[in-house]
Amino acid sequence: MIRQETMNLLIKYFQDYPELKGIPASSEEIKHSENILGIKFHDDYIEFIKKFGGASAGLDIHAFHNSTLVGEETVIELTQGFQKLLELHEQPMNKLYAISDDGSGNPILMDQQGHIFIYYHDSSEMEMLYESLDSLFKETLLGE
């Protein structure tokens, strides 16, 4: 769960930078995309996108109606692109979904426990970046 202290920080951040916030996701959109992808999103991701939509808060986090600065790709499109990439590399990895990318074609992924990874498409290696969205926001917005 995203801690209340972190959530308050995010609320203030998006008040200061409203152009970085998307349109909040609905429960129907979330369920529909989970069904399409065959994945259950982590509660932290759901909490974030229900409040802020696809938004940029230290990392661009894609949902359905993203801030124009995040781009138009949805979590569904990013995840399906990641799944195709894995098929090319013959590395089945289910239960991961793409919430972002690093700008070089490497998807940023979240697992069902809320851990955040980067998948290096050139080497087919994965590295954990953050234990949770909460730790991502603390590090990127507070520098902790």
Predicted stretch roles:
Residues 1-107, 141-144:
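A surface-exposed partner-binding patch
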Residues 107-109, 127:
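Short helix/loop capping segments that flank catalytic or ligand/cofactor-binding pockets
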Residues 64, 121-124:
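Short, highly charge-biased, low-complexity peptide segments
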Residues 126-144:
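Compact, glycine/acidic-enriched structural inserts
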Residues 111-113:
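Short acidic-glycine loop/turn motifs at beta-strand connectors
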Residues 103-106, 115, 123:
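Short, solvent-exposed loop/turn segments at secondary-structure junctions
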